[in-house]
């Protein structure tokens, strides 16, 4: 069983850092493309002649296609060279931007959004497996942190950049601006990524769900799912909390959200060092500290400066956490990281949906304190499961 083996890397000598940074640029464009409609929804809907609600479904369809792709790609790709597969996903990303920019109607717009969903699911499901093949084992967490840095940076700039470009050159021009950056990412990956043949041992296996037969995988994915549920049960409703409870000004709101994003970017730069020193203690400490922050926000929600400080710390922890869980996939399933990555994408997407939905129901029917308390309880559940996971992993390895 791969879970009983020490972590191995397909590449023990050469580090292809050019490929890592090329993929990070690809991550940046992917995330910017995924969330660009958020800041352009009103003019987009008006131009296509649909309601804002229908236009917003473009985000939903990209998420749904990301899940379906992540669960099926490893099997469908077979022995295909993973370099060619990544390049194909980058082409889909560029094509998506062009389709949306020139969409004459709602159907073409949704087709473009579906393509970006396929690219997102395909890329993230392969990220851990690709990191294993690009750098030596002791640098895998650093490579994954760099990938996630592109994610964090895009999260910070996508909405304000989209809003600015939309006001300057129109929403179509904003989407079109992503195409040359995607083309640059394609060319950079083309010349910096090594050939990465498909794994003939895993390509012929049954679906990714077979991994649930391994206790350590089931427990780990459950812990990961609870973490993301807890995170988004709270974070989805940060804006109404800041506006109605903390009562920040519009400029103050923007500043706090920017602080969260910048702190998250810093977190991704630091987390690799911490993970290498203390892997499971870090995975346990992150949700524990976030649960403490959720409780502290309940007690100090009316103090602007304390809330800003707490949410900045929250952003640093929450954005660093995915690097930890992707590193867990790379360490736990070094020979099956693609299938494990596919399951991870699906679990995270489902957890985000469940967490935000549950948080919203509590927010509407009870009060914001109950929503934050729910988040804290889910995060504490993740702490308990991660602690059990570390003990199980230790017993299996021993």
Task: Indicate where each model-derived feature is located.
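Helix-breaking motifs and short loop linkers at transmembrane-helix boundaries and internal kinks
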Residues: 49, 81, 102-108, 247, ...
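Conserved MFS/SLC helix-loop-helix module at the cytosolic interface between two early adjacent transmembrane helices
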Residues: 68-104
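Helix-to-loop junctions at the C-terminal end of transmembrane segments
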Residues: 69-81, 267-279, 363
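Paired small-residue
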Residues: 96, 107-115, 305-313
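Helix-loop-helix hairpin linking two adjacent transmembrane segments in secondary transporters
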Residues: 108, 137-138, 145-191
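Cytoplasmic helix-loop-helix junction between adjacent transmembrane helices
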Residues: 112-150
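C-terminal transmembrane helical hairpin of 12-TM major facilitator-type secondary transporters
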Residues: 281-324
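A late C-terminal transmembrane helix in Major Facilitator Superfamily
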Residues: 332-368, 374-375
């Amino acid at each position: 069983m791969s879970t009983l083996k020490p972590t191995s890397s397909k590449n023990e000598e050469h580090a292809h850092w050019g490929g890592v940074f090329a993929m990070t640029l690809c991550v940046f464009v992917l995330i910017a493309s995924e969330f660009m409609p958020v800041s352009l929804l009103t003019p987009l809907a008006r131009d296509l002649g649909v309601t804002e609600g229908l236009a917003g479904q473009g985000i939903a369809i990209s998420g749904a296609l990301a899940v379906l792709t992540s669960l099926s790609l490893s099997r469908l790709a077979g022995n295909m060279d993973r370099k060619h597969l990544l390049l194909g996903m980058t082409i889909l990303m560029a094509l998506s931007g062009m389709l949306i920019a020139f969409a004459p109607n709602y159907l073409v717009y949704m087709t473009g959004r579906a393509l970006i969903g396929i690219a997102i699911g395909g890329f993230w499901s392969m990220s851990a497996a690709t990191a294993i093949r690009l750098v030596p084992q002791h640098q895998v967490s650093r490579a994954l942190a760099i990938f996630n840095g592109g994610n964090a940076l895009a999260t910070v700039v996508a909405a304000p950049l989209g809003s600015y470009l939309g006001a300057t050159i129109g929403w179509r021009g904003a989407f079109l601006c992503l195409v040359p950056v995607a083309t640059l990412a394609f060319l950079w990956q083309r010349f910096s990524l090594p050939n990465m043949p498909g794994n003939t041992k895993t390509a012929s296996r049954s679906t990714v769900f077979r991994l649930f037969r391994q206790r350590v995988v089931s427990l780990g994915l459950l812990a990961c799912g609870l973490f993301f549920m807890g995170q988004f049960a709270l974070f989805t409703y940060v804006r109404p909390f800041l506006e109605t409870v903390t009562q920040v000004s519009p400029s103050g709101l923007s500043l706090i959200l920017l602080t969260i994003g910048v702190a998250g970017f810093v977190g991704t730069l630091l987390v690799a060092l911490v993970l290498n020193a203390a892997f499971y203690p870090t995975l346990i400490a992150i949700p524990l500290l976030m649960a403490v922050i959720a409780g502290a926000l309940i007690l100090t929600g009316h103090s602007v400066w304390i809330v800003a400080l707490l949410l900045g710390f929250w952003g640093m922890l929450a954005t660093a956490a995915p690097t930890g869980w992707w590193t867990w996939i790379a360490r736990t399933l070094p020979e099956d990281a693609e299938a494990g990555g596919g399951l991870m994408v699906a679990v995270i997407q489902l957890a985000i949906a469940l967490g935000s939905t549950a948080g919203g129901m509590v927010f509407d029917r009870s009060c914001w304190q109950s929503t934050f308390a729910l988040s804290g309880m889910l995060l504490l559940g993740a702490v308990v499961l991660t602690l059990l996971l570390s003990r199980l992993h230790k017993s299996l390895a021993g």
